[in-house]
Amino acid sequence: MLSSRWFVSMAAAAVLALPSSVLAEGQPLPEGAWTLSKDNWQKAENLLPDPVLKRVKAGDYTFTVVPLDDQKFKENYTADYWAASEANEGKYELDAETCGLKAKDTGELPDYVWGMPFPRIDPKDPQAGCKVAWNFYLANQMGEGAGATFTLNGIDRNGEFRRIKMWLHANSYMGRTKKSKENPENLRATTMSHAMEPADAEGVNILSQQLNDWTSQDNLWAYLPQMRRARRVNAATRSDPIAGLDIFADDLNCYAGKVEYYKWKIVGEQNILAPVIGPYSLKQASTDSPTRFEVTIPYLRGGYETPGNKGAPWQITENLVLVERPVWKVEGESTDPYYNFGKVIMYIDKDMSRIYWKNVHNRAGEYFYTAMCSYHFSKSDDDSFGTTTPNMVMGVNDKTDRAALGGRYATQFIERDFDPSQFSLRALSRLSD
């Protein structure tokens, strides 16, 4: 029987993964690639968050760093995205009290924004952190709808101690490439998830809804097959550990909540080594449906799965690379007294609006946790549609010396025309019939 604590943490998950990190066997590394290890850790000084660099120095992590064509990397997003972003200059402003987005000409919250609302950031602007956060949030949604089956793996020094398998479907409204035909509940985004394994989790279904306003909390419902009913859940559980693992629902994309939930400020700018698959766009393969496409993802093998691994059991040993990217160093902090995190430091790409790393402090101000958030990019054959997708979170609790991997799916699908009824309370209950 599921405990209530287990149930709440699973609900939070839906508001949603020899060794060195190399490409799969048979895939040569690009010219200029190099290995970062304990033997040359100094090369990454000021290019990794301090807790991560310490683990490289200790021999826990070995990474493959590859050179990057910055312009080609930007072309992971479509030309239309960049043009729309430029056209947005001067169109939007922020509500000073809530950090909510509003159209400058009407003062109203928009229901749809294509491209970055703030294509130029002045770090001296007191609202710059909030503007960076909005660029990040809306870039998350350009893929419109998506789904994948994945695992959550709890890992300590002895290897894997827990594994959960589930699928997650997500539909976006506010920042998608093409505006949705219908949005009957005035949502920014919605997700549905279904737990598949282990047996004590099977049939647990989660529905989340993010309303398009400045002040409301997310709507969360969990359906437990033993109870045969859906139950409302507090959105602050996004900061609770998922099923006792060292990973949190707010780790999706390195931040999964509304922009308005945090107070944001830029505290620096630098270059960072960013975790990606690729680093250039993967292919979106056609299916029988004109609105659905599939993307094959190289598997991110963990150290605990790799014979001869000498680093941390949770390090990624295959198909993950690091690329050097310019980032804003942004501090975020929730004002919700029920939210467990205190100050959170995030490293956000200045161009691509991706959060690659975050360092988390508790409400007493003590650092305890780092999340590494990896992404891949995919495009249609004619380059007219592209998106970015999270493919893994490596969450590491530096107080307990444990970690969790979330994601690491082998395939994903992109759905450009989800039926809204698939994300309803009725659908939530029927999943386990």
Description of each model-found segment:
Residues 25-119, 227, 237-317, 324-326, ...:
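Non-transmembrane domains of secretory- and envelope-associated proteins
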Residues 186-192, 218, 323-331, 354-358:
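Short, hydrophobic/aromatic-rich segments at coil-to-beta transitions
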Residues 18-24:
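Sec/Tat signal peptide C-region and signal peptidase I cleavage site
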Residues 25-218, 224:
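Solvent-exposed N-terminal domain segments of exported/luminal and surface proteins
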Residues 11-16:
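Hydrophobic helical h-region of N-terminal Sec-dependent signal peptides
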Residues 321-322, 326-338, 342-352, 361:
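Extended serine/threonine-enriched, polar tracts that run as long, contiguous segments within proteins
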Residues 1-10:
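Bacterial N-terminal signal peptides that target proteins for export
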Residues 202-205, 216-217, 339-344, 356, ...:
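Short, surface-exposed coil-to-beta transition loops
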